[in-house]
Amino acid sequence: MGLLQELAGHPLAQQFQELPLGQQVGIGFAVFLVLSVVLNVLNQLLFRNPNEPPMVFHWFPFVGSTITYGMDPPTFFRENRAKHGDVFTFILLGKKTTVAVGPAGNDFILNGKLKDVCAEEIYTVLTTPVFGKDVVYDCPNAKLMEQKKFMKIALTTEAFRSYVPIISSEVRDYFKRSPDFKGKSGIADIPKKMAEITIFTASHALQGSAIRSKFDESLAALYHDLDMGFTPINFMLHWAPLPWNRKRDHAQRTVAKIYMDTIKERRAKGNNESEHDMMKHLMNSTYKNGIRVPDHEVAHMMIALLMAGQHSSSSTSSWIMLRLAQYPHIMEELYQEQVKNLGADLPPLTYEDLAKLPLNQAIVKETLRLHAPIHSIMRAVKSPMPVPGTKYVIPTSHTLLAAPGVSATDSAFFPNPDEWDPHRWEADSPNFPRMASKGEDEEKIDYGYGLVSKGSASPYLPFGAGRHRCIGEHFANAQLQTIVAEVVREFKFRNVDGGHTLIDTDYASLFSRPLEPANIHWERRQ
């Protein structure tokens, strides 16, 4: 008590007590902030745990490296990899987040055992309000694997043969009716157009003409509102009555009702639709326990089916168009490839035609390499995980983060990695990737939805790896290649200013996309 009385009697203390309450609060907060920064810095410098990965230095507790990471995740990963190596930890909104990059890091996280890592725990707060209840991350992993299997076995070669003409027709019809593509030339904000094209093509091909007939530009806007539910702040505030969450919830109810009404119509008719689309397949599916897939789960899986690919295909197709506007000569090469390999009359595209267009395939491959739609893939740690080849053990208090885009832009595997070069995928190119041989990368594993490649030896994983690898990989490739081929037949692109610059990337969402507006100049071929 004596010490406290002496401090209270100190002239500075008396001056502080005489200040207005507002100033006292301000000074108190400033002192608290300074002390927390000092203690945080001392903790990093003096009490580092040698059995855990190095910590990215940060001044403020809780905030940590959240801002620098959020501004430009790929640059953040590259800079800290150069400082700390392939495994390091940073503070993301108060949570210790351990990054493991490179092929070994990708394998460590993405092929982690179910007892060690968990995706559901991380993502359910984001996905459940968007997709709906009882599907994807709102159900046990075993059930999710069954749901993936239902959808995967419907994606047959025969189905793809029917998809390509549907996608081609949708692309042509879109450009005929769009007011932004009237006349012989003009300027268009291409990401908005590609978002609509990808939702129309996917809904028609995967979900049938009956569903497609209910889609228009307004429904595409509803899917955009659903997509905005994936904003990073929703990891913490998914429940809050924020404007984008209100739009998300309205969109989810509206879209789910469209699917539920269609399911009821089909049930009433005996589900005897002539089309073998995904909805018909799911309505006829049964879980291993003998329970038929409930209608609300069919509706929610239909939302997930489109949403899971929409942000990726929309972003990737936008980047492709922007790259073609940046390099018009590549667009002309694509056109001449079709003339040479398919015939000067450019007959209607077929699924088999896509295999005859290697540059068209490489355009998609190279764009996915440089513009990966998902820059961060997270997993909760369920049991302590030793990092192979190191002394580090990742505790359960950490979150794991994989960044496959880091290895996809690593000069050790891709010469001149920052150069967009679709010709690099040709065997005689000086920029040809230095990757594992096909035999080394063909290890297969069945997580419950069919054999998939582990991808553990590959630095190029545009569709992920492990049990959560994208089941729509082949559809996405067919969709993107068909869209590109049809656009090239119809248009010539260039940058509005005639230069060769490229717009920056928007990292505000969980999914990387071009900053908008991203305008290109288009001209119809004669």
UniProtKB/Swiss-Prot annotation:
The record's annotation in Gene3D superfamilies points to: Cytochrome P450
Listed pathway(s):
Steroid metabolism; ergosterol biosynthesis
State what induces this protein. Expression is positively regulated by the FgSR transcription factor that targets gene promoters containing 2 conserved CGAA repeat sequences.
| InterPro entries according to UniProt | CYP450_sterol_14alpha_dmase, Cyt_P450, Cyt_P450_CS, Cyt_P450_E_grp-IV, Cyt_P450_sf
Tell me one GO molecular function of this protein.
Answer: monooxygenase activity
A Pfam family of this chain: p450
**Broad class of enzyme this protein falls into:** oxidoreductase
User: What's the EC number here?
Assistant: 1.14.14.154
Domain of life per record: Eukaryota
Subcellular localization, as worded in the UniProt entry? Endoplasmic reticulum membrane
Positions binding heme in this chain are: 470
Binding locations of lanosterol: 123
What is the protein's membrane topology class?
Answer: Single-pass membrane protein
CDD domains xrefs: CYP51-like
**A GO biological process held by the record:** sterol biosynthetic process
Its UniProt entry gives the catalysed reaction(s) as: a 14alpha-methyl steroid + 3 reduced [NADPH--hemoprotein reductase] + 3 O2 = a Delta(14) steroid + formate + 3 oxidized [NADPH--hemoprotein reductase] + 4 H2O + 4 H(+); a 14alpha-methyl steroid + reduced [NADPH--hemoprotein reductase] + O2 = a 14alpha-hydroxymethyl steroid + oxidized [NADPH--hemoprotein reductase] + H2O + H(+); a 14alpha-hydroxymethyl steroid + reduced [NADPH--hemoprotein reductase] + O2 = a 14alpha-formyl steroid + oxidized [NADPH--hemoprotein reductase] + 2 H2O + H(+); a 14alpha-formyl steroid + reduced [NADPH--hemoprotein reductase] + O2 = a Delta(14) steroid + formate + oxidized [NADPH--hemoprotein reductase] + H2O + 2 H(+)
Presence of the UniProt keyword Membrane in the record: yes
Described function: Together with cyp51A and cyp51C, encodes the sterol 14alpha-demethylase that plays a critical role in the third module of ergosterol biosynthesis pathway, being ergosterol the major sterol component in fungal membranes that participates in a variety of functions. Essential for ascospore production. The third module or late pathway involves the ergosterol synthesis itself through consecutive reactions that mainly occur in the endoplasmic reticulum (ER) membrane. In filamentous fungi, during the initial step of this module, lanosterol (lanosta-8,24-dien-3beta-ol) can be metabolized to eburicol.
SUPFAM superfamilies found in the cross-reference section = Cytochrome P450
Indicate what this protein is called per its UniProt record.
Sterol 14-alpha demethylase CYP51A
The entry assigns this protein to a family as follows: Belongs to the cytochrome P450 family.
